[in-house]
């Protein structure tokens, strides 16, 4: 029996095991007290990266089994229906919205609430949420702060990429931007003529520096920085980490330029096998008393998503560190930021996270999804019927573990009335 999941289907489908992580996965990384030596193009002995490259190959081999199904609209549709059926949180979002008076209850909302409930941050009353629209993180923090922490106020600023074309819609599905314009740092393309125009693109070094400046001018201190950025890679999931390197570097750098001492950080990542990603984690380890790689239970186990969490920032950048990192973003290359041979103990902990989250949990869930596809291709209703009782048990358990309470009307975020619905 799997260490992660169990379910007894009975009869001809007694093999059926729901994919439900029993625990919030959290792997701690050691703080680095030695001096930080940033390099423009650090070299790394191949032996250090060998097991990470092997992990990448093993995971991609399993992902590749789904690739042929993505080529035909009919099989692609069926695959996503199957994966939706084995999503243990499907339906929970509506329950949370209506039972607890919650807002913008997306999957991002569930993940952020779970992170806040599990990580025991010292203060989250003032937050900068980057790469944020449609607003699930802000809404979850607002709900948590008022119902669990009982802060008298919640102050926030946020940013997201503003589309360059007037014909492209801003992802403001719930009206959080429209109804709270003073809380947002990015600007419409209509303001391009302004000297300090910033569209929220964190892959541009000048934007990053300017966003951090705007954030700290409007909100001081910043107790919590979050960033949930990710580029749509289409069907090319094997290159998801590589294609997001610059974006994830930019969103991390924005946070490190704006987060106050004593503050906490939550950053979205995917796999953690590329030398540049590993070096970025090494950089984080110099700034936070506690550093973790996490996988919330509400983060779908079929995907490679991870969240890096830093608790209690110990120091700010030196002018030289800021200069080197901004220059690297401006003239980006994906060589390591530091000499990885100086961080072998930390890299052992990162690899344990890779094994736990990707080589065990994700691969097992992907294999489970493919088995369900083969057995339930034309029997999706039957699959849903099998899983429905277990989903209810698990969702009820999640609500108890994460201590949900009703949000008072006076503490709700201001949203545009026409777009306050939730994602099922």
Swiss-Prot record:
Presence of the UniProt keyword NAD in the record: no
Q: Which domain of life is it from?
A: Viruses
What InterPro entries does the record point to?
A: Adrift-typ_MeTrfase (IPR025807), mRNA_Cap_2O-Ribose_MeTrfase (IPR050851), RNA_MeTrfase_FtsJ_dom (IPR002877), SAM-dependent_MTases_sf (IPR029063)
Where is this protein found?
Answer: Virion
A cellular component term (GO) from this record? virion component
- Outline the inducing conditions: Expressed in the early phase of the viral replicative cycle.
Which keywords does this chain's UniProt record carry?
Early protein, Methyltransferase, S-adenosyl-L-methionine, Transferase, Virion
Instruction: Identify the residues that bind S-adenosyl-L-methionine.
Output: 135, 228
Record domain Adrift-type SAM-dependent 2'-O-MTase: where: 103-315
Instruction: Tell me which Gene3D superfamilies the record gives.
Output: 3.40.50.12760
EC number assigned by the record: 2.1.1.-
First-tier enzyme category under EC: transferase
Query: Can the keyword tRNA processing be found in this entry's annotation?
Result: no
Q: Name one GO molecular function term.
A: mRNA (nucleoside-2'-O-)-methyltransferase activity
* Swiss-Prot/TrEMBL GO biological process terms: 7-methylguanosine mRNA capping; methylation
Q: Which residues form the active site?
A: 268 (proton acceptor)
Q: What is this protein called?
A: Probable methyltransferase EP424R
The record lists the organism as: African swine fever virus (isolate Tick/South Africa/Pretoriuskop Pr4/1996)
